[in-house]
């Protein structure tokens, strides 16, 4: 690996940013920082000031602004950054001061500085600082090539303890780089190094090198959009979260589709990739579009309905309205609620029963965007058809980690047939490469040619193979592996086979709904009386 000094990396980054139309400003100490902030804030609020016959803020007015900004926790300051401040002037006027333009994110003032010295418990100099409207919102810490990247992360953690204060509490993002590896993360000191992310392009190719990262991630409009739209203020933990690149691109694809066409689409993101956060941000940003009347986030089970509501509330309190029953859903649809969480069962009842459908007939032609939690086979039946027939102007998007293709379409229907084209992919190979999910070892076993899963001989052969390799594949025979089967009746049959082959083996059963099961649960045997009547006694033995 070639060596490059930290100073050379810093100079190169600043040169790149200046070529990207960043203004360089020399800020030696905090007094310079405040003076520059006043000038930039006046530039950013020029129109508001001119409406009141002014060109700037008086000294006492700027002091009011500083007092307002410097109060509160880091989380509260992140909220202030995104709000307007009502500045009451001495002559009785009120000026609404904007610190960040979130709607037209390119229309902010971008500057870069370096080696700003700050006095805290210790005197510290920060490598490269990006200022937006005069506020330090992005801090970049560099290490020379060859130095472990985590050293830059650890240095930022030390800054949290020794020097970050005042306007530096408004930092939204950190960037760390040693030239060949570059990562970004939200200003959340408690999150840990595992929540630092590599930026990528839309097809998940990483931009590790600092120069490439700067050109794409630090481009002014992209950075303004990420800060303004793609940082989540997590109400539950009172912390900042930033979306990963694949989440960003997925939401952008949905927004583009809603704004520029009536076509549907689906997002193929592997399990464990943060689907709830992605869907929340998609629902939130789509709901802000002027021509969208409502956004419905549709899940397949009541327990998921409750869980999703809880998670959405943690992201932003009051952002969504949940529906405990069909009556409540109809009321929400009649109200001004912009984001509604419901189940496909409640939605089907609302459009199928005249008592309900007559109440929501007025909005059936409205611009409604539906985001489905999982594009599985429950959307291939009559319920989905009824919903889409009623809301004839609806646009639908689905999330899935297991799309249905022609090759695995049991009933002939595919995800593309129902939801349209795939808008973005983030597959398990990408997640393993990013260390977002654990890797795994695949070991193939080729048995006999019988392909019928219910065939008794095949099931016995599988059971014997597992028992023969039991000691090799487990740790002291403890519970450390899962054997997944497609239905409860099949589980009972396997239980009997295992017990007949080895009466001493311990077996525990976990019952769950499959991601791609049919709505009436015929595949699992969970929704009918079959399991209760024939299997409950045998299942009790598995406890």
Regions found by a protein language model. Give the residues of each.
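Conserved C-terminal RecA-like helicase domain
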Residues: 338, 453-543
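Short secondary-structure boundary/capping segments
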Residues: 146, 154-158, 186-195, 282-283, ...
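Conserved RecA-like ASCE P-loop NTPase motor core of nucleic-acid helicases/translocases
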Residues: 268-269, 293-301, 479-487
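Signature of the SF2 helicase/ATPase Hel1-core->accessory helical subdomain module
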Residues: 149, 196, 345-451, 459
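Short, conserved secondary-structure transition motifs
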Residues: 173-185, 331, 486-489, 511-519
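Short glycine-/polar-rich loops that comprise or flank the Walker A/P-loop
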Residues: 135-137, 168-172, 291-293, 338, ...
């Amino acid at each position: 690996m070639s060596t490059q000094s930290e100073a050379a990396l810093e100079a190169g980054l600043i040169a790149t940013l200046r070529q990207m139309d960043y203004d360089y400003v020399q800020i030696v100490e905090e007094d310079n920082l405040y003076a520059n902030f006043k000038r930039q804030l006046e530039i950013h609020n020029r129109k508001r000031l001119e409406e009141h016959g002014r060109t700037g803020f008086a000294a006492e007015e700027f002091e009011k602004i500083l007092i307002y900004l410097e109060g509160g926790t880091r989380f509260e300051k992140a909220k202030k950054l995104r709000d307007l401040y009502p500045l009451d002037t001495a002559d009785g006027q009120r000026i609404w001061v904007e610190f960040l333009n979130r709607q037209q994110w390119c229309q902010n003032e971008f500057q870069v500085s370096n080696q700003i010295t700050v006095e805290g418990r210790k005197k510290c100099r920060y490598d490269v600082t990006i200022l937006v409207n005069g506020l330090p919102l992005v801090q970049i810490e560099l290490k020379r090539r060859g130095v472990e990247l985590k050293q830059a992360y650890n240095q930022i953690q030390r800054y949290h303890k020794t020097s970050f204060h005042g306007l530096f509490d408004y930092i939204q993002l950190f960037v760390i780089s040693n030239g060949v590896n570059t990562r970004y993360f939200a200003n959340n000191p408690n999150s840990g190094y595992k929540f630092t992310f590599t930026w990528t392009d839309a097809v998940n190719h990483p931009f590790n090198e600092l120069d490439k990262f700067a050109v794409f991630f630090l481009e002014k409009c992209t950075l303004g959009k990420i800060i303004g739209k793609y940082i989540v203020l997590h109400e539950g933990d009172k912390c900042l979260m930033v979306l990963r690149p694949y989440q960003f691109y997925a939401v952008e694809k949905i927004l583009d589709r809603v704004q520029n066409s009536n076509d549907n689409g689906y997002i193929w993101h592997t399990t464990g990739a943060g689907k709830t956060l992605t869907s929340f941000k998609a629902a939130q940003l789509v709901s802000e579009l002027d021509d969208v009347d409502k956004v419905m986030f549709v899940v397949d089970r009541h327990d998921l309905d409750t869980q999703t509501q809880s998670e959405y509330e943690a992201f932003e309190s009051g952002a969504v309205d949940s529906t405990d029953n069909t009556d409540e859903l109809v009321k929400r649809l009649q109200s001004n609620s912009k984001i509604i969480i419901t189940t496909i069962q409640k939605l089907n009842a609302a459009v199928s029963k005249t008592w309900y459908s007559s109440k929501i007939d007025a909005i059936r032609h409205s611009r409604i965007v539906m985001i489905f939690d999982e594009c599985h086979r429950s959307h291939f039946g009559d319920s989905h058809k009824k919903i889409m027939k009623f809301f004839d102007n609806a646009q639908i998007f689905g999330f899935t980690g297991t799309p249905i293709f022609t090759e695995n379409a049991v009933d002939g229907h595919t995800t593309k047939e129902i939801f349209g084209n795939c808008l973005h992919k983030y597959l398990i190979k990408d997640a393993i490469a990013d260390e977002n999910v654990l890797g795994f070892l695949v070991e193939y076993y080729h048995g006999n040619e019988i392909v019928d899963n219910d065939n008794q001989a095949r099931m016995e052969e599988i059971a014997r193979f597992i028992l023969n390799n039991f000691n090799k594949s487990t740790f002291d025979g403890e519970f450390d592996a899962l054997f997944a089967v497609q239905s409860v009746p099949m589980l009972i049959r396997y239980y009997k086979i295992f017990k007949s082959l080895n009466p001493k083996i311990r077996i525990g059963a976990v019952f769950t709904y499959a991601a791609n099961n049919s709505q009436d649960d015929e595949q699992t045997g969970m929704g009918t009386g079959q399991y209760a009547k024939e299997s409950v006694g045998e299942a009790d033995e598995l406890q």
